[in-house]
Amino acid sequence: MIYQSPTIQVELLEDNIAKLCFNAPGSVNKFDRETLASLDAALDSIKQNSNIKALVLTSSKDTFIVGADITEFLGLFAQDDAVLLSWVEQANAVFNKLEDLPFPTASAIKGFALGGGCETILATDFRIADTTAKIGLPETKLGIIPGFGGTVRLPRVIGADNALEWISTGNDQRAEDALKVGAVDAVVAPEALEAAAIQMLKDAVAEKLDWQARRNRKLSALTLPKLEAMMSFTTAKGMVFAVAGKHYPAPMAAVSVIEQASTKGRAEALQIEHQAFIKLAKTDVAKALIGIFLNDQLVKGKAKKAGKLAKEVKNAAVLGAGIMGGGIAYQSASKGTPIVMKDIAQPALDLGLNEAAKLLSAQVARGRSTPEKMAKVLNNITPSLDYAALKHSDVVVEAVVEHPKIKAQVLAEVEGYVSEDAIIASNTSTISINLLAKSMKKPERFCGMHFFNPVHKMPLVEVIRGEHSSEETIASVVAYASKMGKTPIVVNDCPGFFVNRVLFPYFAGFNGLLAEGGDFAAIDKVMEKQFGWPMGPAYLLDVVGLDTGHHAQAVMAEGFPDRMGKSGTDAIDVMFENKRLGQKNGKGFYVYSVDSRGKPKKDVDPTSYGLLKDAFGELKTFEADDIIARTMIPMIIETVRCLEEGIVASPAEADMGLVYGLGFPPFRGGVFRYLDTMGVANFVALADKYAHLGGLYQVTDAMRTKATNNGSYYQA
């Protein structure tokens, strides 16, 4: 053994080829400080051994290296620029040391080689991948750029155009696609991986392969003619900005760094990367996006833990077919859990099956599935008009019409047909789980399971704990949601649960603006373009449905009369009473037609403006800051109330609920990250300016205390 540490082992194989194996104690390899220090020490040991003629990098795991240890980032990025620069330079010295070894090097890549893992393989002369390999630099998705030489080496390996696409999108690439652009030199079967890498090194040692010429290309400036370079980078800037937009600076910074470094050798090029990396690491966007990544890990960790308490779900059922039932059935079956779809009407079952088939056909058309897989998934969906089909179901999801009496009746009925230990969950967006539980003989085996529409696209599922729900029930439904490929957050029962409870104060703020003559299209534009929502409030209400919004608003007003009670007609009422229900009937705030691709296309409609003018008078212009404050303050305060009341367990889960359930702008990180970035004291001062607008604008006592103490919701 040439070198050994808890994360890396180096041994000498036949023909004096050294093998460096990444072998961290956990399930995956990642570059934390310890692994980086071990790699540095291992390379020193390798350099000192005069017998070594070549080096192969391998992994003992199913993956190569998944990237840097992101849990270290926020603390590290909070350091002074000089400290951060020192860390980046020390880390890069390790990768330079690998690249500068006096003999040929190769990486044997399986599974993920992402971020720092990808930058490791770029520092070797040859790269062999097996068919499971996925390679990429996802840093721009975290608001930063590669910091271990990725922007320098990748363009010199695969060309500037390809590198610009890889780095600016942050997407990982399959082995076959990496081979096409020259990121890897060969793709082999998993069992042949190490042998193929060693054979390539033997050929390099025997001078059949010119490893030094390859290395020199990475150390030199890019060989791009001036005119071609100018055209390439100008085109890239336009394309990248069109996708990334003004709120996500990292992709554009990556283009700029690659352009500036294109005429430099390695040392100068790395300095350009270092400076841009440090600048981006200090941004609020990086803090927000890294925070989302860490929050996602926390939520998934909780779900994994729940799996240990959970009853295994081998068979499921959904009550109520149609679009929602079909979506739930598709999601369950496509992730491997057979499901019975029960309804009282054959046309509803046909609609549900058609919905599942339509979603599967789209997967096949996009090349993400095959007709064989589609048939297998459809065979996992069993339509039935009879409750008897549910007798083997471990979990039954009730998804009938959103009416308390009908739901209660169906829940009471189904309890008589399922097994003693079956779990029943209600897919409801507003109806109290405690209320529905009153109709059940075993309320401990009942909870809420709120899917968001469309089911196949929306990642969030709210699992609602009723006062009688057992821990096993909650754990089992959380585990089932995870198995379906969803991100579950557990919330306690209250009107609207978590997501709808915080959404409707936002709509109330919007209604307030319209009642004073606000222009809904202008408000949408501000909330989309400036704040960053995927849809403004008027457009979102049209998509949700004004009938659904009208009903949910009434539920919220009844549940929280002090803050959400209504004294008169608002804009939602106006649209609903005039049968303008949104996209579902082609007219709401906007009017809808179908474009050439069959998608709804919205246009401003003078009729809706006329109705609002009749109700609220002439249009009035509001400043953008005023629009943002009046819509967002109620949502933010209500979110804080949910945390204080224990409806949601942590700031992390609340923020993930907002990002995944409502499309809260990821670059802002969620309400609690937004509050911390703004400063709680600054927010309280802003809210106080609008306190005269009513209860939704009144901050809590705990918020005032936190503001006075200069506190934050996340620990630095």
UniProtKB/Swiss-Prot annotation:
<feature type="binding site">
    <location>
        <begin position="400"/>
        <end position="402"/>
    </location>
    <ligand>
        <name>NAD(+)</name>
    </ligand>
</feature>
<feature type="binding site">
    <location>
        <position position="500"/>
    </location>
    <ligand>
        <name>substrate</name>
    </ligand>
</feature>
<feature type="binding site">
    <location>
        <position position="296"/>
    </location>
    <ligand>
        <name>substrate</name>
    </ligand>
</feature>
<keyword id="KW-0413">Isomerase</keyword>
<comment type="similarity">
    <text>In the C-terminal section; belongs to the 3-hydroxyacyl-CoA dehydrogenase family.</text>
</comment>
<dbReference type="InterPro" id="IPR006176">
    <property type="entry name" value="3-OHacyl-CoA_DH_NAD-bd"/>
</dbReference>
<comment type="pathway">
    <text>Lipid metabolism; fatty acid beta-oxidation.</text>
</comment>
<dbReference type="InterPro" id="IPR029045">
    <property type="entry name" value="ClpP/crotonase-like_dom_sf"/>
</dbReference>
<feature type="site" description="Important for catalytic activity">
    <location>
        <position position="139"/>
    </location>
</feature>
<keyword id="KW-0276">Fatty acid metabolism</keyword>
<keyword id="KW-0520">NAD</keyword>
<feature type="region of interest" description="Enoyl-CoA hydratase/isomerase">
    <location>
        <begin position="1"/>
        <end position="189"/>
    </location>
</feature>
<feature type="binding site">
    <location>
        <position position="453"/>
    </location>
    <ligand>
        <name>NAD(+)</name>
    </ligand>
</feature>
<dbReference type="GO" id="GO:0006635">
    <property type="term" value="P:fatty acid beta-oxidation"/>
</dbReference>
<feature type="active site" description="For 3-hydroxyacyl-CoA dehydrogenase activity">
    <location>
        <position position="450"/>
    </location>
</feature>
<feature type="binding site">
    <location>
        <position position="324"/>
    </location>
    <ligand>
        <name>NAD(+)</name>
    </ligand>
</feature>
<dbReference type="GO" id="GO:0070403">
    <property type="term" value="F:NAD+ binding"/>
</dbReference>
<comment type="function">
    <text>Involved in the aerobic and anaerobic degradation of long-chain fatty acids via beta-oxidation cycle. Catalyzes the formation of 3-oxoacyl-CoA from enoyl-CoA via L-3-hydroxyacyl-CoA. It can also use D-3-hydroxyacyl-CoA and cis-3-enoyl-CoA as substrate.</text>
</comment>
<comment type="similarity">
    <text>In the N-terminal section; belongs to the enoyl-CoA hydratase/isomerase family.</text>
</comment>
<feature type="binding site">
    <location>
        <position position="407"/>
    </location>
    <ligand>
        <name>NAD(+)</name>
    </ligand>
</feature>
<dbReference type="GO" id="GO:0008692">
    <property type="term" value="F:3-hydroxybutyryl-CoA epimerase activity"/>
</dbReference>
<comment type="subunit">
    <text>Heterotetramer of two alpha chains (FadB) and two beta chains (FadA).</text>
</comment>
<dbReference type="Pfam" id="PF00378">
    <property type="entry name" value="ECH_1"/>
</dbReference>
<keyword id="KW-0443">Lipid metabolism</keyword>
<feature type="binding site">
    <location>
        <position position="429"/>
    </location>
    <ligand>
        <name>NAD(+)</name>
    </ligand>
</feature>
<dbReference type="InterPro" id="IPR008927">
    <property type="entry name" value="6-PGluconate_DH-like_C_sf"/>
</dbReference>
<protein>
    <recommendedName>
        <fullName>Fatty acid oxidation complex subunit alpha</fullName>
        <ecNumber>4.2.1.17</ecNumber>
        <ecNumber>5.1.2.3</ecNumber>
        <ecNumber>5.3.3.8</ecNumber>
        <ecNumber>1.1.1.35</ecNumber>
    </recommendedName>
</protein>
<feature type="region of interest" description="3-hydroxyacyl-CoA dehydrogenase">
    <location>
        <begin position="311"/>
        <end position="716"/>
    </location>
</feature>
<dbReference type="GO" id="GO:0004300">
    <property type="term" value="F:enoyl-CoA hydratase activity"/>
</dbReference>
<feature type="site" description="Important for catalytic activity">
    <location>
        <position position="119"/>
    </location>
</feature>
<keyword id="KW-0511">Multifunctional enzyme</keyword>
<dbReference type="GO" id="GO:0004165">
    <property type="term" value="F:delta(3)-delta(2)-enoyl-CoA isomerase activity"/>
</dbReference>
<feature type="binding site">
    <location>
        <position position="660"/>
    </location>
    <ligand>
        <name>substrate</name>
    </ligand>
</feature>
<dbReference type="GO" id="GO:0036125">
    <property type="term" value="C:fatty acid beta-oxidation multienzyme complex"/>
</dbReference>
<dbReference type="InterPro" id="IPR001753">
    <property type="entry name" value="Enoyl-CoA_hydra/iso"/>
</dbReference>
<dbReference type="GO" id="GO:0016509">
    <property type="term" value="F:long-chain-3-hydroxyacyl-CoA dehydrogenase activity"/>
</dbReference>
<feature type="binding site">
    <location>
        <position position="343"/>
    </location>
    <ligand>
        <name>NAD(+)</name>
    </ligand>
</feature>
<dbReference type="InterPro" id="IPR012799">
    <property type="entry name" value="FadB"/>
</dbReference>
<dbReference type="InterPro" id="IPR050136">
    <property type="entry name" value="FA_oxidation_alpha_subunit"/>
</dbReference>
<keyword id="KW-0442">Lipid degradation</keyword>
<dbReference type="Pfam" id="PF00725">
    <property type="entry name" value="3HCDH"/>
</dbReference>
<dbReference type="InterPro" id="IPR006108">
    <property type="entry name" value="3HC_DH_C"/>
</dbReference>
